[in-house]
């Protein structure tokens, strides 16, 4: 029995030339999109590899600098070293070169200044006491006034010392004190003053530095100086601090004086404090009628044997200046002992009697040293003097101390870089891009 065969209907297949062309174009478009996306993805991967490698290279910051001074730097970072480290961290099959770089010493230490201020703002929350704020506000005018007062005192001492009798004459005593080493007058134990010193000629503030090419940066506001000083007082020690041995014992004094030795810097700071105190003390004497009367009485006594008319008033003025100078020496003594001295004196905080001025600096001196709880201590006066210094000098001298303590070259420390990278992708496609990294 024959099986019946079922016929399957056949269809005729055909496509127009237009449709075929359209289909080819669609395939080409999809292929181009896929290729473009693939190339862009490869670019993104290369750029991500570069960013990651650059961040990893700068993650090799100097740990000792961070631990001691809370400053981030990449030490000894030449393009050769940077290229090697970036290859190690995966930025391979590319060429890199530095477009711009910034070093810690650039722009007179502005890079260091920015990091120090940022640290103080984030972690210290420094706020000046009323006494320190008053000192910072009036210290410039005090120093200007002191220059005039000092000139007046020198003139009057030169004029009147020869004509007045030596016996019972405080002006002769003050003339002798001004020619005496200040440290021996204000320190209870001059032999215990540190004699440590450094060689300043090879330090950043004096030598020719390697310079980056990032260019100038925007300077901070006036309030940032308070934060810089807060950073300094936390990371650098002064006479009244006790820490492990460093290149210099009196680091804050070096920031103010800039001399190679501790002794020279301490003497310079004592002179500056003496200047501020003398102007303030003289200003107070001009308001105290009782003390002016005392000076006038002594002036009459000293001038009783002279026949020069009008000299009594001149001698009185000289005695007031000399008295202010003697009181200022006592003030500095009090500060070096760790006690406090008020910015503005009163009759209750005045320490040196005019009758005892002649004995100052001798074994017979009689001085009532007063610790004023509401005043400023030595650190407070140093902080006020630091506020008067320009930030460039403070920054560069801070870098001097960092180099001396850590034995590194701060102008070889990189803090910011912009690199240009060139990558060759498949089919000869090239990609050039830049990457920037900065410690923040």
What function would you assign to each model-found segment?
Residues 70-440:
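Long, compositionally biased low-complexity segments
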Residues 2-81:
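Alpha-helical assembly-interface signal, strongest on the long, hydrophobic N-terminal helix that forms
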């Amino acid at each position: 029995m024959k099986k019946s065969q079922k016929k399957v209907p056949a269809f005729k297949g055909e496509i127009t030339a237009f449709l075929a062309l359209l289909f080819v174009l669609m395939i080409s478009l999809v292929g181009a999109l896929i290729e473009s996306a693939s190339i862009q993805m490869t670019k993104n991967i290369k750029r991500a590899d570069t960013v990651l490698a650059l961040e990893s290279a700068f993650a090799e910051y100097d740990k000792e600098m961070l631990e001691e001074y809370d400053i981030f730097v990449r030490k000894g970072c030449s393009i050769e070293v940077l290229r090697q480290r970036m290859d190690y961290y995966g930025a391979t099959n590319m060429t890199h070169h530095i477009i711009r770089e910034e070093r810690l010493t650039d722009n007179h230490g502005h890079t260091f200044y920015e990091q120090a201020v940022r640290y103080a703002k984030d972690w210290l929350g420094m706020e000046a006491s009323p006494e320190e704020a008053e000192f910072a506000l009036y210290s410039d005018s005090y120093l200007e006034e002191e220059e005039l007062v000092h000139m007046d005192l020198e003139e009057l001492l030169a004029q009147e010392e020869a004509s007045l009798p030596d016996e019972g004459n405080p002006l002769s005593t003050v003339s002798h004190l001004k020619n005496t080493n200040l440290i021996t007058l204000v320190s209870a134990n001059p032999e215990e003053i540190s004699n440590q010193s450094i060689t300043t000629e090879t330090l950043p503030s004096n030598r020719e530095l390697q310079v980056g090419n990032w260019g100038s940066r925007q300077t901070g506001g006036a309030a940032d100086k308070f934060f810089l000083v807060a950073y300094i007082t936390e990371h650098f020690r002064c006479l009244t601090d006790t820490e492990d041995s460093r290149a210099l014992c009196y680091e804050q004094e070096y920031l103010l004086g800039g001399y190679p030795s501790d002794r020279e810097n301490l003497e310079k700071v004592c002179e500056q404090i003496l200047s501020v105190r003398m102007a303030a003390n003289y200003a107070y004497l001009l308001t105290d009628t009782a003390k002016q009367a005392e000076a006038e009485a002594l002036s009459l006594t000293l001038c009783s044997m002279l026949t020069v008319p009008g000299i009594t008033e001149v001698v009185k003025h000289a005695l007031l200046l000399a008295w202010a100078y003697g009181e200022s020496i006592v003030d500095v003594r009090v500060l070096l002992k760790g006690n406090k001295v008020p910015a503005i004196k009163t009759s209750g905080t005045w320490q040196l009697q005019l009758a005892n001025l002649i004995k100052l600096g001798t074994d017979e001196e009689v001085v009532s040293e007063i610790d004023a709880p509401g005043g400023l201590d030595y650190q407070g006066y140093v902080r006020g003097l630091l506020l008067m210094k320009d930030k460039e000098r403070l920054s560069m001298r801070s870098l001097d101390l960092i180099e001396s303590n850590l034995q590194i070259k701060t102008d070889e420390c990189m803090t910011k870089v912009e690199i240009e990278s060139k990558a060759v992708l498949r089919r000869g496609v090239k990609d050039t891009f830049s990457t920037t990294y900065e410690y923040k």
